[in-house]
């Protein structure tokens, strides 16, 4: 029996139902690096997955980076579930609705590339994975399968998926996506973090890491001065205001319809919203793995319907 594994291929992070790691990839060629953590051996070459951040590439199929990160994600999820390293897998992945129809065939072929089974080593463990199927679903909307009640309670709502590079917007009317309202803003968490880093450098001369900024935005411990923390919080509020303004300018009246916010940036907005924003209603899905879980449930539902025919 094959295993369904949902994978959210973000610009900022790769997520499965139980794992999340940065979408960075460092190639070491034929030379084994110093660490086994995140170490992928494939095709005679060594790669460290989850290190740093790779350059933004609008087309994720232009090189093998996201395929290699997919193998790492499969290995991590299999290990987390306590499953054998030799198994058959059905991948449930996603794309933004704004590019769904255009990119779906290419992304599906990309994830199915190569001979089966796919043999590789991850963190010292040998894997032999047969990818039986790749199914692609709309990001954001699939995540609502984890909160079915949301679709039943409101006639209209705005879905806001705050990813690494983009914030994808789409109105949902009577539980059906209004595809003609799909809109994408280049205001994801990478933009937020980069702006904060630059502002801190400008005001204090200090160079913060992504991890430091992310911890402070999430309200988690980080050893910095109160001055730096104040700058980060101020910029977090500024980012939230900019996002709300851009969403309104895109034609979505946040004072009139409820908004469901998910993705890695949702926690930032949740901490920096103010009553003076006057929003109709905001619902936060704060688990950054919610898309991956939604993809799995969507493929499970599709498979069930097929078996009943």
Model-derived regions: residue spans:
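Nucleotide/phosphate-binding catalytic cleft detector across ATP-hydrolyzing
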Residues: 1-157, 176-191, 203, 210-309
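Conserved blade-register residue in beta-propeller folds
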Residues: 16, 169-171
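Ser/Thr-glycine-rich phosphate-binding loops at phosphate-binding pockets of nucleotides
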Residues: 162-168
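A contiguous pocket-lining binding segment that forms or flanks enzyme active sites
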Residues: 199
């Amino acid at each position: 029996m094959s295993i369904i594994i949902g994978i959210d291929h973000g610009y900022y992070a790769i997520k499965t139902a139980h794992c999340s790691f940065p979408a960075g990839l460092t190639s070491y060629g034929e030379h084994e690096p110093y660490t086994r953590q995140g170490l992928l051996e494939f095709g005679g070459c060594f790669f460290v997955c989850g290190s740093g951040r790779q350059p933004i590439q609008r087309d994720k199929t232009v090189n093998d980076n996201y395929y290699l990160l997919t193998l790492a994600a499969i290995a991590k999820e299999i290990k987390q579930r306590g499953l054998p390293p030799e198994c058959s897998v059905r991948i449930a992945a996603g794309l933004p609705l704004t590019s769904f129809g255009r990119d779906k065939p290419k992304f599906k072929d990309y994830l199915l590339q190569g001979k089966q089974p796919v043999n590789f080593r991850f963190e010292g463990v040998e894997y032999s994975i047969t990818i039986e199927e790749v199914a692609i679903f709309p990001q954001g909307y699939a995540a609502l399968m984890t909160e079915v009640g949301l679709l039943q309670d409101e006639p209209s709502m705005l879905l806001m998926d705050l990813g690494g590079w983009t914030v994808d917007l789409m109105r949902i009317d009577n539980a059906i996506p209004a595809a003609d309202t799909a809109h994408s803003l280049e205001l994801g968490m990478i933009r937020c973090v980069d702006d904060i880093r630059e502002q801190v450098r400008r005001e204090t001369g200090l160079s913060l890491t992504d991890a430091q900024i992310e911890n402070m935005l999430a309200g988690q411990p980080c050893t910095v001065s109160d001055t730096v923390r104040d700058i980060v919080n101020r910029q977090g509020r500024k980012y939230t205001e900019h996002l709300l303004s851009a969403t309104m300018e895109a034609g979505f009246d946040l004072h009139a319809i409820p908004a469901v916010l998910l993705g890695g940036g949702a926690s930032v907005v949740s901490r920096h919203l103010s009553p003076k924003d006057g929003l109709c209603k905001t619902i936060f899905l704060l688990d950054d793995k919610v898309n991956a879980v939604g993809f799995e449930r969507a493929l499970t539902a599709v498979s069930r319907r097929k078996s009943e025919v």
